[in-house]
Amino acid sequence: MLKFIFMIMFIFFLFFKKNIYWMVQNLIFLATCLFMIKISSNYYFCDISYYFGMDMISYGLILLSFWICGLMLMASEGVVRYNNYVNLFLFMIVFLLLMLIFTFSSMSMFMFYLFFESSLIPTLFLILGWGYQPERLQAGIYLLFYTLLASLPLLIGIFYIKNDNYTMNFIMLSYKNLYNLDFLYLCMIFAFLVKMPMFLVHLWLPKAHVEAPVSGSMILAGVLLKLGGYGLLRVFSLMQVLGMKFNYIWISISLIGGVLVSLICLWQMDLKALIAYSSVAHMGIVLSGLMTMTYWGLNGSYTLMIAHGLCSSGLFCLANISYERMGSRSLLINKGMLNFMPSLSLWWFLLCSGNMAAPPTLNLLGEISLLNSIVSWSWLTMISLAFLSFFSAAYTLYLFAYSQHGKIYSGVYFFSSGTTREFLVLMLHWLPLNLLIMKSNFCMLWI
């Protein structure tokens, strides 16, 4: 692990030079390739140092962080074109990548909390510094207050566990099981529920997505939402008994909330808001599967987290490509694109079909195992799951049909069909999404 952390840290010295944007992007992809070679089939923590280690759960999410950060730099070519504080932008992204690697490889609960919160700072600066509308200040405040307010009880919970067990190490604590500490259970999981985000505490997400630049949206949808799921996977190892007692509450809220959010998607007119709300619906089903605490549920939630990271990041990339051409995110203006961006319509179709879990995407594998686990937990959930699956397909088709079909907006007179760079970014989102299903033991057999 240390070699990758040092590689990323030494990239910081490049920021004193000019014209190093694409070099940094190439270095991040080089680090990704080196990290891919390092795949271990070790289901326990390996590469252990004093505070850092890596197992199969963290491996997939660190790899996703590397991949998405490389693609963010490819997608944000506008920053270089307009020379919009390029080196500061690079610093934010590389610092965010470093924080994410630290978060996913922390073995101490307190270190995990520290880096979990630190990843918020560069995200906030990305939204405030490179966002488009003046409302980004409000979005930044929403993001900050929701996550910080929910995280304070987590800190108290961590110190309580330290006091009780004399350790904060995940491995040591996995042999413990906490009983009769209902308030501690709420303290420990509430921060992760907000980060996921669970329905009812999801209001910061659409705001943050709509105001963020393309890089902010990609990392937010791709990796930062997964921090919540990762935290729950780690914390539930010491809260199984309390989970059996209370988890039905979160499953009910998530499934009913998922259906309601899917309905909200159907009357969205903003491309980015629609994709952001669809993220909330997907994370609802991930959360439900996680809370069943079954083998299928945990594996399925992890698989869908990785699949959703690639898929929704690609969709935000597509929305940005349209926004750069049209100057608007409205579906009333971004319509009839099949007429003047036909080559891009293929990518819209492929990523939309991934979003509604069509085969052979990784989303399908995740959703099938999640459906299995949630239905085995209770037959009643079939009702809301049926609605969720149906509306998920409905709003994705609505997005595709409205944006690609119909008459062209009459105000458009000149259009660039798309550059090789944009097609490459989209292909690098779509390829792993469809190829990973061939190597699904990487996602499914880590328990």
UniProtKB/Swiss-Prot annotation:
Q: Can the keyword Transmembrane helix be found in this entry's annotation?
A: yes
What membrane topology does this protein have? Multi-pass membrane protein
Could you state one GO biological process linked to this protein?
A: electron transport coupled proton transport
Domain of life, per lineage: Eukaryota
The record's section on InterPro entries has: NADH4_N (IPR000260), NADH_UbQ_OxRdtase (IPR003918), ND/Mrp_TM (IPR001750)
Offer a single GO CC term for the protein.
Answer: mitochondrial membrane
Q: Where are the transmembrane segments?
A: 28-48, 56-76, 85-105, 110-130, 141-161, 183-203, 213-233, 246-266, 273-293, 301-321, 343-365, 380-400, 409-431
Recite the UniProt keywords alphabetically: Electron transport, Membrane, Mitochondrion, NAD, Respiratory chain, Translocase, Transmembrane, Transmembrane helix, Transport, Ubiquinone
A GO molecular-function descriptor: ubiquinone binding
The enzyme's main class, written as a single word, is translocase
Which Cys pairs does UniProt list as disulfide-bonded? none
- Predominant place of localization: mitochondrion
Q: Where in the cell is it found?
A: Mitochondrion membrane
Per its record, the protein catalyses: a ubiquinone + NADH + 5 H(+)(in) = a ubiquinol + NAD(+) + 4 H(+)(out)
Instruction: State the family it belongs to.
Output: Belongs to the complex I subunit 4 family.
Q: What does this protein do?
A: Core subunit of the mitochondrial membrane respiratory chain NADH dehydrogenase (Complex I) that is believed to belong to the minimal assembly required for catalysis. Complex I functions in the transfer of electrons from NADH to the respiratory chain. The immediate electron acceptor for the enzyme is believed to be ubiquinone.
Name under which the protein is recorded: NADH-ubiquinone oxidoreductase chain 4
Native source species? Aedes aegypti (Yellowfever mosquito)
